[in-house]
């Protein structure tokens, strides 16, 4: 499995670069979230996929710990943004572009984006910060993808 991770990253990065024609960190929300976690987070993004009951696709039940709670809050944030700030869009917030950058080791959402894009960026920024703050609680036994 460990040899697949670098290959997965290389393929993901290649797709990331090849699917963009804009500034270095302007991508569709899922790519933004992946790279925001990769660059601004304490753990690789794939360490959270399948973690607990809420990290990754779907989400149900009670969070198993504070890491899983971060993912639950993120899911709710996306839902709220999809209903409110992005309600006029006819697509899921996971596929709306936004801009962000790092400044003094902090994630900054671009204020020139639409209200919708800024709200999505804030959801992603908040989860990365939440995951970082609760990193001590990360327990590999809760990761269904690797455990």
UniProtKB/Swiss-Prot annotation:
Propeptide found at: 23-28
User: Its principal location?
Assistant: secreted
Name this protein carries in UniProt: Phospholipase A2 Scol/Pla
Q: Which CDD domains match?
A: PLA2c (cd00125)
Give the cofactors, semicolon-separated.
Answer: Ca(2+)
Compartment(s) of residence: Secreted
Q: Which residues bind Ca(2+)?
A: 54, 56, 58, 75
Role noted for this protein: PLA2 catalyzes the calcium-dependent hydrolysis of the 2-acyl groups in 3-sn-phosphoglycerides.
Q: Which organism is it from?
A: Scolopendra viridis (Giant centipede)
From the broadest rank down, the organism's phylogenetic lineage runs: Eukaryota, Metazoa, Ecdysozoa, Arthropoda, Myriapoda
User: In the UniProt entry, which residues are flagged as the active site?
Assistant: 74, 124
**Record InterPro entries:** PLipase_A2, PLipase_A2_Asp_AS, PLipase_A2_dom, PLipase_A2_dom_sf, PLipase_A2_His_AS
Which region is the signal sequence?
Answer: 1-22
Keywords of the record, alphabetical order, are:
Calcium, Cleavage on pair of basic residues, Disulfide bond, Hydrolase, Lipid degradation, Lipid metabolism, Metal-binding, Secreted, Signal
**Tissues in which the UniProt entry reports expression:** Expressed by the venom gland.
EC number(s) stated in the UniProt entry for this protein: 3.1.1.4
Single GO term (MF):
calcium ion binding
Which Pfam families does the protein's record reference? Phospholip_A2_1
């Amino acid at each position: 499995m460990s040899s697949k991770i670098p290959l997965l990253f290389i393929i993901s990065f290649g797709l990331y670069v090849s699917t963009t024609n804009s500034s270095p960190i302007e991508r569709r929300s899922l790519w933004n979230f992946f790279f925001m976690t990769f660059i601004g987070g304490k753990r690789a993004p794939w360490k959270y996929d399948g973690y607990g009951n809420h990290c990754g696709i779907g989400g149900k039940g009670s969070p198993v710990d504070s890491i899983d709670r971060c993912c639950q809050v993120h899911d709710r944030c996306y839902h709220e943004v999809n209903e409110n700030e992005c309600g006029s869009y006819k697509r899921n917030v996971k596929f709306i572009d936004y801009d962000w950058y790092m400044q003094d080791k902090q994630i900054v959402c671009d204020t020139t984006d639409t209200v919708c894009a800024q709200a999505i960026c804030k959801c992603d920024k908040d989860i990365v910060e939440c995951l970082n703050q609760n990193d001590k609680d990360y327990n590999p036994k809760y990761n269904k993808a690797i455990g």
